[in-house]
Every structure is written in C-alpha cells, then in structure tokens.
Amino acid sequence: MDITQLLAFSTKNKASDLHLSAGLPPMIRVHGDVRRINVEALDHKQVHAMIYDIMNDAQRKHYEEFLEVDFSFELEGLARFRVNAFNQNRGAAAAFRTIPSRILTLEQLNCPRIFADLALKPRGLVLVTGPTGSGKSTTLAAMVNHLNENQYGHVLTIEDPIEFVHESKKCLVNQREVGRMTLSFANALRSALREDPDAVLVGEMRDLETIRLAMTAAETGHLVFGTLHTSSAAKTIDRIIDVFPSEEKEMVRAMLSESLVAVISQTLCKNKEGSGRVAAHEIMLGTPAVRNLIRENKVAQMYSAIQMGNGFGMQTLDQSLSELVKSNQITNAEARGKAKIPENFPG
C-alpha cells in the first residue's frame, strides 16, 4: 500500500487519524479508538519514503535538521491532512489528522445557539479550549464560516499549519501559515494590527508574546478567536495569567477582564450507537460577575458563576453532559467518564 491508498482507506473508514510507525502495521483512530490495519508491518525505509514523497524541499530540510516537522497536505477530491512527521525508537513515524474538505456549520455540529452570537461579536477574545483531538479546529472553522456568511469584513487566520480552507464569501479571508507565510504567530499578530482585520483567528496561543498580542488586538477593537490546550474555563484563565511574570499579573488580569467574551471548553464523547462522537461544552461568558472574578483573582469561584449563569447562555460541562444523556445521544456511563463530578451520573 502506498500513502495515497492508506489515506483513502483511512478516510473511507471515517478515521480521524492515520498513524505510520516503523516496525508496526499502519493504524487508524476511529471514534476515539486506535485500530491496526490488516496489512504487514512497515519498516523504517518504507515509512521514511512515504513521508518524503509528500514533503517539499523545505519540509524535508526541517525534518532532517530538527527530526520532526508539521505540515499540511491535500489529496485532491479526498481531504486535507495535518501531518506531524517524527522519529521514534524503531525509526520514522508520522501522524495524519484528517481535515474534512467541507466546513460543517454550527447547526450540523449541534453547537449551542450562543456560538452563532459569539461569532458575530464586534470585538473581544473568544477562546475555544480542550485537549488535542477534541474538535477545537472544527468548532472554530464553523464559527469563522458563520461570520463569513453573515457579515462583511476582513478575517485573518494565523495557523500552523492551515487546516480548513475558507472561501471569501461576505468576508475577505486571508489565511497565513506559520513557517511558510510568516515566521511566527507573534510576528503575524504584530503585522495583523496593520492589515485592517475585523477578526483574527490565532491557531495556538502558546507563548507569552502571542498571548499578549492577542489580548492587545482584542482590546483595540478586533474580534480574536484563539485556542489553548486547557480543559476548563478556570484552568484557561489560570494558564493565561501564569504565563506572565508576577509584576505583570495584576495588569494582565485587568486586560483579560476587559477583553474576554467567552471561553468554550469542549470534549468529545462517543455517541450511544458507537458510530461517531458528539461534543460536550463548558461555556463561560464575560459577564460582569465573571469579569469581576478575573480582576479579583477569584478563579476558584468561576465554576459556581457558570452554574448560576444559565440565563446568560452559560453551562458547566456536567450540565452539557446531562443534556446529551437526556436527549439519548450518549450513555450515562460515557457521561460519568467525562464528568467533572462523576457522582452527578450514578449507575
């Protein structure tokens, strides 16, 4: 099997990921579970050749120098893939994340209605968080698409690598890939403020400078979408504040309390039939009460504020899981395994 056949097989079987690892057969992740493909094990030379076939010269050079590389790759008529090539103890390896060629709408993703409102906010910081593979990119792509279909403006995305490709509909959409079209997230964000954007998507807010620039952009009248690998709203606020030195923390709390629009923390659950996955969301909005908690460093009280903020559109993860159980989308056992307080789902 060549790489094209493996990726076609992976896509046909609705896999989210394909794994190549020297010394083992190829494997796919379907509905969260990793399964072996029933073919012979691949050796180092085979995996290395498969990876090199789809890299350009710059990517090969980066791989040789740093022993790993991120890039995106498209099989026309099939899908795009986000690729990380690396080395492991048996030899070459790579992980391919499938990026559907069609951007799903917020309705198709069964997102809460408030997501559509958040996508059309005139300014502020909207964060979508969760572990790797929790569907953050898919949710953000749907939000950007909703903006693109409903308002006129300029949307700038900064990604590593570019995942979903957006057509310019009502919005002009410019997508920039770190490493190919800009040197870093921070460089691109610094330039973004001079490029007349209405909305900026930051693929990953992973360092102090990027986080600072994203908050500045939100504070100066832009809508900024960003992602972090945190599992709850409270942990997201802590993570942002903790990046900064102690003498800046108070100022950062004040900035964040002014600019934060929402934190959406999501996790994927297996559906009841075992034929797919659905997202559960914790939603924290920048209400006056939440802004006050951020300013006064009372992060521990945020969970209660979210619990009591139903009227504003807020919900805890457990409240979201409970709705999914009630609507017969997931089992009680699946909810218990994902819940913040498992005792909420006895049985």
Language-model features, listed with the residues they occupy:
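Short, flexible helix-loop junctions that flank or precede catalytic/ligand sites
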Residues: 1-347
